[in-house]
């Protein structure tokens, strides 16, 4: 009888292991960072626990890329950064992703295009790091940048004692001017 019970429990466990897992409940809330030119808006996703979790600041790439990883210059949506945030939360890691100044929900914080500088992005990332450092639920801050966001994140993280780690996703491996020239050559502008 005991062997049959053990066999049944083993069978049950093996059978249940093949079932899809229930989705993790995410806690997502809007966040705002006030700057001298206006409000930068983002979303913070936290795992389903009270405190003691690390957070990843997710910095989007170049151009018209929003906090979810979608570019207004490209057709469709991939939501890559949103999916990343959800996946991190499922592993007990919080994240904060934001729209850069002049983009999507942070459009009003943008200066005119000719006045914007790379340093503005670094200053904004540092502002978000300071924002996160005041949250007592967080056990450590990590910065993740995608594409141009990797350069911004690296500059914002260097010599910053508030940052425990830095992650570059598809960061530049060659001089920025080469990348910009290449990207501009791929843009097809039709003449009227």
Residue ranges and their predicted role:
Residues 50-51, 56-87:
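Short, surface-exposed "cap/lid" segments of acyl-processing enzymes
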Residues 114-134:
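Alpha/beta-hydrolase active-site loop
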Residues 79-107:
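Conserved alpha/beta-hydrolase
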Residues 21-51:
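N-terminal cap/lid segment of alpha/beta-hydrolase-fold proteins
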Residues 131-183:
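Primarily recognizes the serine-hydrolase "nucleophile elbow" in alpha/beta-hydrolase
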Residues 185-192:
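Residue-level detector of conserved catalytic or cofactor/ligand-binding positions
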